[in-house]
UniProtKB/Swiss-Prot annotation:
Keywords: Amino-acid biosynthesis, Diaminopimelate biosynthesis, Lysine biosynthesis, Methionine biosynthesis, NADP, Oxidoreductase, Threonine biosynthesis. It catalyses: L-aspartate 4-semialdehyde + phosphate + NADP(+) = 4-phospho-L-aspartate + NADPH + H(+). Phosphate binds at residues 109, 203. The lineage of its organism: Archaea, Methanobacteriati, Methanobacteriota, Archaeoglobi, Archaeoglobales. Substrate binds at residues 174, 200, 233. Its EC number is 1.2.1.11. The keyword Amino-acid biosynthesis applies. This is Aspartate-semialdehyde dehydrogenase. Pfam families: Semialdhyde_dh (PF01118), Semialdhyde_dhC (PF02774).
Amino acid sequence: MRYSVGVLGATGMVGQKFIQMLAEHPWFKLTSLAASERRVGKKYGEEVDWIVSREVPDIAKDIEMVPMDPKHVDADIVFSALPSDIAREVEPKFAEAGFVVASNASAYRMAEDVPLVIPEVNPEHLGLIEVQKKNRGWDGFIVTNPNCTTIVLVLSLKPLMDLGLRTVRVASMQALSGAGYPGVPSLAITDNVIPFIKGEEDKVEEEPLKLLGKFNGRKIEFADIKVSASCHRVPVIDGHTEAVWVEFDREVSVEEAKAAFESLKPLDLPTSPEKVIIVREEPDRPQPRLDRDAGNGMSITVGRIRKDGERGLKYIVLGHNTVRGAAGASILNAELMIKEKII
């Protein structure tokens, strides 16, 4: 069975990445593209300012765009690439109308009854769906994926939790595509690093606590760890690089950490990579140009794992921010829900 799917916010950068990844998906058939009022009724291929790689997929070219209204969208699942302020208004309307909303937006990530999910990290948090539907009286529901920087970070932290992880410090070097299009002005970022991204550090410090927490049948009990973040925009197109310092409640060797990273098992899902975490031994890896497309953009790459004091380690982690960190994350969540027979 193939499920009909739609994209909310279809013309933006993440919306385009959704369309690119859904075009030949074995489980999903792209049927609806929703956009702003000025684009309604126009064919996607004629109206979109296509900025991701390759051409507009044939399946999307002749689809007439519709309003962001449940009455006009013909789909079983909608993927939301909306800005947070618009998502806060639009997504509940779709959930109330019975749609499955797989959202990349930040609007409902930290809501108590909304699952914030990375399939390899906390699939059991999907149990919140029934809590959400009961609380809100909806026929459908919203499931979210984290911020792009958070996803890359937490995929690397999950295997370390069993080693007694207590404290995390992270400095991100975030790609320009994370700011959308047209994004950061060229004169602001050329020959420069911008040491501030509005709202980003709060997300990176808060979201991991929910993701790594426990579902008790009613709500998420947040993880008992501390995360401190400093986020920076750098002149790279795609691929977020993060320098991470971690402390444990005991001494942990580099070899233990490597084994833990490599133990994170992939899922038997269409968008899942063969290896979730790739560990590089070279002293100068990972790098965005060399490693962002690993696993078709769905793997993360860890390198430069070193001791840092008696109970600490430090390492570099990199992931593709618009694939694993955005569209691919929502698609993987939808695949997981199908596998678990939630959809």
